[in-house]
Amino acid sequence: MEAPLVSLDEEFEDIRPSCTEEPEEKPQCLYGTSPHHLEDPSLSELENFSSEIISFKSMEDLVNEFDEKLNVCFRNYNAKTESLAPVKNQLQIQEEEETLRDEEVWDALTDNYIPSLSEDWRDPNIEALNGNSSDIEIHEKEEEEFNEKSENDSGINEEPLLTADQVIEEIEEMMQNSPDPEEEEEVLEEEDGGEISSQADSVLLQEMQALTQTFNNNWSYEGLRHMSGSELTELLDRVEGAIRDFSEELVHQLARRDELEFEKEVKNSFITVLIEVQNKQREQRELMKKRRKEKGLSLQSNRIEKGSQMPLKRFSMEGISNILQSGIRQTFGSSGADRQYLNTVIPYEKKSSPPSVEDLQMLTNILFAMKEDNEKVPTLLTDYILKVLCPT
């Protein structure tokens, strides 16, 4: 099969008139090659390629000529190619490197790509790990963002359950950070009392320091021996007075510690009973939902059965008794496993000051009675309303 012929006359119509030949001079081309000739004789054959292109050639001839051109170009590896692609001098390269070293932008860009000395770059696995590290980090960040969005949308992002001590500490911090404008005078009085107590403590500390100095200086056999009787009696009076003062302060601090411990126990018991009541209320709600579903299914089945059977009587004694029993249960409370006082609502008035220990004790008793479904709930609730919410 003959190879197809290729005509290049149409492509080079604009090139032919550009060359003007003179009888005595060499041809001059306006669009041709560069005016200077290649110095290397091995590369001089490239100048004749432009003249050979303008002819009828087949595809096979073009391929062969292309191979010849490649052979001519890569035949002599020692040929000088500075005229084709000039190479920079070593001095120019050093100057460019020095200027790049002084550039802050270049340093900031290249510092992130410095290889670590601990890694062996000859290991083929290192390149794969380093290449995929950024992709893995990006994928992890995208997963975290997606999980956060899904949690926020679905309401899963709930706060963790806190212990009773943590809840009490948070309540105390909230109460401390919310001052009461109505009790500013009491706060000022307490501050004055605190200042007085701090002053008394400072006085006691000063007396104690003075006594320790005298003890260190004089409480030796020789020091006491050289002291007079009046000095000894004065020192004895000072020691006895300091002992009395320190004993009173110790008793006061111990009483304060007992009060704080009792208050902490009351708060812990209040939080514990409150959590137990909330859990039981949640269980009761779930149980009521299940009962409603079962009741709805039973009603549907009864309707289907009644529809299939013809009613003989419009009213019966059994139906009337069932209606009366259901009405009594709804009026006076349900019997059995249903709790009557568990869902009792306790009225509470939010104040700027924290509830006192007595108030917490009353609330704890009400919650404990609600948990046990005790009949004392109405009585305790009435006492709480009369003594705390509406005192006479």
From Swiss-Prot:
InterPro entries: FEZ (IPR011680). Residues 1-36, 175-196 are annotated as: Disordered. Residues 180-194 have a biased composition (Acidic residues). Keywords: Cell membrane, Coiled coil, Cytoplasm, Cytoskeleton, Membrane, Microtubule, Phosphoprotein, Transport, Ubl conjugation. Transmembrane segments: none annotated. One of its GO terms (cellular component) is cytoplasm. The modification Phosphoserine is found at residues 58, 298, 316. GO terms for biological process: cellular response to growth factor stimulus; establishment of cell polarity; establishment of mitochondrion localization; hippocampus development; mitochondrion organization; negative regulation of autophagosome assembly; positive regulation of anterograde axonal transport of mitochondrion; positive regulation of neuron projection development. One of its GO terms (molecular function) is gamma-tubulin binding. Belongs to the zygin family. Homodimer. Interacts with the NH2-terminal variable region (V1) of PKC zeta and weakly with that of PKC epsilon. Interacts with UBE4B and SAP30L. Interacts with SCOC and ULK1; SCOC interferes with ULK1-binding to FEZ1. Directly interacts with SCOC and UVRAG. Stabilizes the interaction between SCOC and UVRAG during amino acid starvation. May be involved in axonal outgrowth as component of the network of molecules that regulate cellular morphology and axon guidance machinery. May participate in the transport of mitochondria and other cargos along microtubules. This is Fasciculation and elongation protein zeta-1. It comes from Mus musculus.
